Amino acid sequence: MAGHDVQYGKHRTRRSFSRIKEVLDLPNLIEIQTDSFKAFLDHGLKEVFEDVLPISNFTDTMELEFVGYEIKEPKYTLEEARIHDASYSAPIFVTFRLINKETGEIKTQEVFFGDFPIMTEMGTFIINGGERIIVSQLVRSPGVYFNDKVDKNGKVGYGSTVIPNRGAWLELESDSKDITYTRIDRTRKIPFTTLVRALGFSGDDEIFDIFGDSELVRNTVEKDIHKNPMDSRTDEALKEIYERLRPGEPKTAESSRSLLVARFFDPRRYDLAAVGRYKINKKLNVKTRLLNQTIAEPLVDPETGEILVEAGTIMTRSVIESIESHLDGDLNKIVYIPNDAAVVTEPVVLQKFKVVAPTDPDRVVTIIGNANPDDKVRTVTPADILAEMSYFLNLAEGLGRVDDIDHLGNRRIRAVGELLANQVRLGLSRMERNVRERMSVQDNEVLTPQQIINIRPVTAAVKEFFGSSQLSQFMDQHNPLSELSHKRRLSALGPGGLTRDRAGYEVRDVHYTHYGRMCPIETPEGPNIGLINNLSSYGHLNKYGFVQTPYRKVDRETGVVTNEIVWLTADEEDEYTVAQANSRLNEDGTFAEKIVMGRHQGVNQEYPANIVDYMDVSPKQVVAVATACIPFLENDDSNRALMGANMQRQAVPLINPQAPYVGTGMEYQAAHDSGAAVIAQYNGKVTYADADKVEVRREDGSLDVYHIQKFRRSNSGTAYNQRTLVKVGDVVEKGDFIADGPSMENGEMALGQNPIVAYMTWEGYNFEDAVIMSERLVKDDVYTSVHLEEYESETRDTKLGPEEITREIPNVGEDALKDLDEMGIIRIGAEVKEGDILVGKVTPKGEKDLSAEERLLHAIFGDKSREVRDTSLRVPHGADGVVRDVKIFTRVNGDELQSGVNMLVRVYIAQKRKIKVGDKMAGRHGNKGVVSRIVPVEDMPYLPDGTPVDIMLNPLGVPSRMNIGQVMELHLGMAARTLGIHIATPVFDGASSEDLWSTVKEAGMDSDAKTILYDGRTGEPFDNRVSVGVMYMIKLHHMVDDKLHARSVGPYSTVTQQPLGGKAQFGGQRFGEMEVWALEAYGASNVLQEILTYKSDDINGRLKAYEAITKGKPIPKPGVPESFRVLVKELQSLGLDMRVLDEDDQEVELRDLDEGMDEDVIHVDDLEKAREKAAQEAKAAFEAEEAEKATKAEATEEAAEQE
């Protein structure tokens, strides 16, 4: 037997064909969401408060300090928030201290700071009753970047940019004359020496002393001449910078100083963030810059005077490691003192080394490091600016390297916590202005923190982020896999990111650093391709937001691949050589071959085993979760694999799902971490279990109650239904499945079914990827799904009185009310079809709705018969089904409703949809198709043992698309069905062709895995042997029921009077420009005429045509289309007197907008009608009065008798 058995959870064993021992379990797949939010609550929020506070008033006599915060219990539970359309949020209370510096008085107070949305255990947020996800954003990391560009003469120039988290950009660039310029915040350029002089190093000698002698420096110094001898060089430089930043304003050295301090050195205006400081220190650090350079002067320990490195030594990695502590310490540190006129007058500490120029052995080049400022320094420092300039000048000498902006070492991820922190910071900085003003205006004696703090800017910023940010998305809840994928999605779009139109090819392309960090396969097709990605299965964020991936460390001494796991970011990985996970190992853990496949800085080739530093932990670490669910992925073309991964996310949950016979072993983990199943939180024993709840007695005696959700509507309108897996008496451990979620079976993801599939044509019905299906799949509910739709009706107060929910609806027969209760609301369990009443509702009729005769009646008899009109909620087109649930919310019951709403009724209708012609089906290899025919079971081809085939696919769908994985799955699936086993064939480490054929042989199938098929209609065998097997097929969300649409009489557009378009508007088919050409080509004048008139916007014509058809009369000639009248009116509005004449030169009257407005005219027959009506009403009133008198008399008589 090939393969070995592996247990997945407690309910499933699979025969696995993997050969590689997994040394690391998959991390929790939604930790990118949960960990980030937890970090935000633990310290992120505190940091934001500490960034903005303390706040002082303008005279610096009062100060508001932040003390701490506390998050209380949420107002609603998760379920209540869902039902009431509320947000699942917790109140946050912040303690502030207000200090009066004049009197020394301190007031401490706790201030309510709004309700903060709380993340659920599943990594989602409930906002206004809907489940949402905050997608992580992929952005350019703050730091310093160097780039090269070739001008039109083929000369290489360099550029550099310091990009902060917030604040001004600082750029350097060289031109064709080898002069170096700098730009501050995208303004006009100035020689870089001007900025150096402004920093307090004004003499040319000082500049040469700092940077050394290079052509770029010489040329720039020559260009930067002293123009105004009245000013010092520093003052002149400051004025020149001010002129660039604030053109047209009077320039003084003082204003320039304060402007530059505000732009670069004020932590409130300029922020590199921790990640920016880390990146700058890493880039400008002398250790990386000295690597493999020849040192030009001896390095001497400043404390002992010992020579650490002799001149002429090549600084290899081992040499640098040997003096690392000195390099991080005071080795070659030089302190420069700026002059008194400088922007910043503190001493500038630099590290300075001289190396031999790589391009010219006779020249010496100076390398300046920024002496590694502390992590807490969040602004750029003069040392950073000088070190950046040094790196820039070194590039021209062949030292250092330019950066690749698409490298994942230069792109980081902003997860939920950081995005939220940014919003709170935004709100707090808006609040800050407000607080300052209130502090200054009000009386200091009586001020308390509560009085000066207005929380509205903060709550508004948070609310806006959750409600309308591009990154706050309605959760994709088609099935558990789509939920999981959505939580792990990385988007380069959104505020502060890219835009679709400006994103070029390079940003979207697969980069070698994506390996193990971002999936190279799973990305949408269409305009977002490459901009929206998915985290790879083992991907993990470090504290700076860079994606790390795990590797096994290789001991270079012994050559043993250890089980020690090291997590590396993309730029750390660049320094090492990494072997692939499928490299063969000996028993002792050394490499079996002398030469192994590996990669170094994106070069995939064979490397000697003795230079390998790390090895991949798993073959599936390259791909995302959805991609890792495709068996035989390695045999599929990447474009089809992309479609396969994306289509699994569109699978509809079926009523009795089956896990695949041929899986990858990823199904269990995906189902477990998706959040759609019920998972045991603690060890214990089941004491009670039914369909709605499970009780587990913990080992310490306490009781856990798990509620099972039944047929809840998901965001996608599918049924979110959980099924209990445990029985009373079962022992459960933490992490075990208590109930399956939708699209799960026995704790494994189960998106579809395992039908028997044959690759053969049949009467041409599977032309162009169409799918032929057996009626068995319809009858046995194999591909049946339940869909729930929510409809709501609300009663409001109108000017004419309140609307009412009632059974008494005007002009509706008793038959239409048979399923309504006494309130007029449909009963649960009623079968409804389109047009049926769900909620009976009447609205008072307005004056404007009264006809002339009714108004006359009001005038004659006073305000008697105020009518109501029927505004009931009815079942829309194509939404028939069974009423699953009704929820009623009223103010009386204390439900929170919108203002003006008195009562809200929600009705849920469930539809059971069997598979039908027009539904879309797919396999896991991008092989999608539409059901074209459902054939009776008896007519389907059958196997020699009499088993009829379930599905027939076209064999032509395989060769050109190169997704051969489906054929291998087919054969292995048939073997698994015959042997009665489930199989796991992990990606890139699955069943080889030898495993496949040996399993086929074990199952007793023929050696070519094909079979003879018999025609179900004639019983004759088909001419050729056919590939028949079991393939996992899923039903996709694109169902014909949602798309089928027909219009009879429907709504028209107000202006053009043409029918609306689209199913949602109950619109018609657009007969467009090209279709008109087709009719013109045939000369079909009458058809054209009616399309342009009766069927479109000839208002009178269409009414008359309808009348003529119903009465069987000939159809009258059409009139003028409304859109023509619109054109005439537009031309008239331009002052052109345009009229329409007929063939006799008589003016054609166009419908006027005022027509039908003259409602005050009362015609004679109207009076007659009114008289009749009045007489009838008077008669009815008289009869009613008489009847009332009679009953009163009877009652009096009875009373007398009793006495």
UniProtKB/Swiss-Prot annotation:
Its EC number is 2.7.7.6. The keyword Cell membrane does not apply. Residues 1174-1203 are annotated as: Disordered. It is an enzyme of class 2 (transferase). It catalyses: RNA(n) + a ribonucleoside 5'-triphosphate = RNA(n+1) + diphosphate. SUPFAM superfamilies: beta and beta-prime subunits of DNA dependent RNA-polymerase (SSF64484). Residues 1174-1195 have a biased composition (Basic and acidic residues). Keywords: DNA-directed RNA polymerase, Nucleotidyltransferase, Transcription, Transferase. Pfam families: RNA_pol_Rpb2_1, RNA_pol_Rpb2_2, RNA_pol_Rpb2_3, RNA_pol_Rpb2_45, RNA_pol_Rpb2_6, RNA_pol_Rpb2_7. GO terms for molecular function: DNA binding; DNA-directed RNA polymerase activity; ribonucleoside binding. Transmembrane segments: none annotated. CDD domains: RNA_pol_B_RPB2. GO terms for biological process: DNA-templated transcription. InterPro entries: DNA-dir_RNA_pol_bsu_ext_1_sf, DNA-dir_RNA_pol_bsu_external_1, DNA-dir_RNA_pol_su2, DNA-dir_RNAP_su2_dom, DNA-dir_RNAP_su2_hyb_sf, RNA_pol_bsu_bac, RNA_pol_bsu_CS, RNA_pol_bsu_protrusion. The RNAP catalytic core consists of 2 alpha, 1 beta, 1 beta' and 1 omega subunit. When a sigma factor is associated with the core the holoenzyme is formed, which can initiate transcription. Belongs to the RNA polymerase beta chain family. This is DNA-directed RNA polymerase subunit beta. It comes from Streptococcus pneumoniae serotype 19F (strain G54). The lineage of its organism: Bacteria, Bacillati, Bacillota, Bacilli, Lactobacillales.
